[in-house]
Amino acid sequence: MVRIAINGFGRIGRLVLRVALSRSNIEVVAVNDPFITTDYAAYMFKYDSTHGRYAGEVTHDDKHIIIDGKKIAVHQERDPANLPWGSENIDIAIDSTGVFKELDTAQKHIDAGAKKVVITAPSSTAPMFVVGVNEDKYTSDLKIVSNASCTTNCLAPLAKVIDEAFGIEEGLMTTVHSLTATQKTVDGPSHKDWRGGRTASGNIIPSSTGAAKAVGKVLPQLQGKLTGMAFRVPTVDVSVVDLTVKLQKETTYDEIKKVIKQASEGKLKGVLGYTEDAVVSSDFLGDSRSSIFDASAGIQLSPKFVKLVSWYDNEYGYSTRVVDLVEHVAKN
C-alpha cells in the first residue's frame, strides 16, 4: 500500500484525491492547504460544478475530512518543510499547488519526511514524465519528478506515434484550452500577461504555452522540432490540441488513422483514444484518457503535411495520469 499526501487542494488536488480513492493500492493519508478548514475541504470535495457531486459519503471533524468512513488528515501549513510527512510515513507527496514545482522548492517535502515527490505541473528543473511516453526512463534514484502539463500529456502520445511511424520534420501546435483558475472573472491586473487579465468568460484569449517545447524533454528526438501557442476559451473543462506537422515520409490520412487506432488499442490503450464520431468538447468531460484522436476532424494537404486533432479533459485526464505516475514511481 502506497501512502500519499496531497499538497494543494485546488482543481487538480481534489480530482487526484477522487482518482486515488478508486485505486486499491493507494492510501491517501493527508491533504494540506493553508487556505481551507476541514468543513470547507469536505464541501469542496463533495460538490464539483464540472464533474458532479461525489457519489459516496463526505463528512469531517476538527482535523480530518472523512470520505466513505476513511479519515484523511487536513493540515494548514504554508511551508511544506513544516509538514509531518515523516511521522505520517508518507511514501509520495503530490504537490498540486503550482508553487513548489522546481527541485529546490519541492525538496521541502523530502525535508519534511516524504520519500518522493510528484509535481503536478511542468518544471524547468525536475525531470518530466508522461505516462505512455517516457515513464520507462524513470529510475529509483529520482526523488522528485514532474507529471508535465495536461497539454503535454495530450500532445506527447500523439507525437510519439506519428514520429515513430512517419517521422516528424517539424510542427506547430495550438491548444484551444478551457479556462483555468489563473484567469480573471472580470478584467483585472495581470502584469506579466496583459491579455490574460481580460474576462475569461467573455473572450477568446491568445496565450503562450510551453507544452509543445516540453515534448522535446520527454521525447528527445523531437527537441527543437515543435512549438506552440494557446487560445483560452470560455468553456469550464475539456481542451483540444491541433497539431500541424510536416512529415518525413509520404503517407495518406487513412494510413495515419490506422496507425493511431492501432496504438490506441495496443500499447497506449487507456492513454491514447480514437474516435470517428461527430464529437464536441462536452463529450469528453470525465474522460480518463490523456489524448483522444478525432479522426473526422483532421485534414491533409499533401502527402507530408497534415493537421491532427486530439481532445483531452485537462482536469480529469491529467489527474488520472498523476495517480498513474505515482503508482509507477512507487513500484520502481
UniProtKB/Swiss-Prot annotation:
NAD(+) binds at residues 11-12, 33, 78, 314. The record marks 177 as: Activates thiol group during catalysis. Pathway: Carbohydrate degradation; glycolysis; pyruvate from D-glyceraldehyde 3-phosphate: step 1/5. Its main location: cytoplasm. Its EC number is 1.2.1.12. The keyword NAD applies. Disulfide bonds: none annotated. It catalyses: D-glyceraldehyde 3-phosphate + phosphate + NAD(+) = (2R)-3-phospho-glyceroyl phosphate + NADH + H(+). The active site is at 150 (nucleophile). One of its GO terms (molecular function) is NADP binding. D-glyceraldehyde 3-phosphate binds at residues 149-151, 180, 209-210, 232. It comes from the Eukaryota. Belongs to the glyceraldehyde-3-phosphate dehydrogenase family. This is Glyceraldehyde-3-phosphate dehydrogenase 2. It comes from Candida glabrata (strain ATCC 2001 / BCRC 20586 / JCM 3761 / NBRC 0622 / NRRL Y-65 / CBS 138) (Yeast).
